Amino acid sequence: MLKSIEKLLNCWDDLKVGNHSSKRIHSVFYYMYFGTIICEADYEREEFKLPYNGAYSHSASTRRAVNDYKRYFLGKGFTLTEEAAV
């Protein structure tokens, strides 16, 4: 897992680490890469979405970031409710 993503996942406040950032609104966290939401996690419902389908879709770094979030939340027992093709 990327160190920057690991820092975001271990923080309960808004944070920016390099090109990665997070925004918290109530129990929902929005994880962004270059300002675009690539993962949305609801800690209350234990669900997450991977709604990303944007300009960086062919980038290996974007695919890696999306896969890191997916692996992390599935490992925590969260349910994947939406996944866009990357």
Q: What does each model-found stretch correspond to?
A:
Residues 1-86:
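Terminal leader/tail segments of proteins
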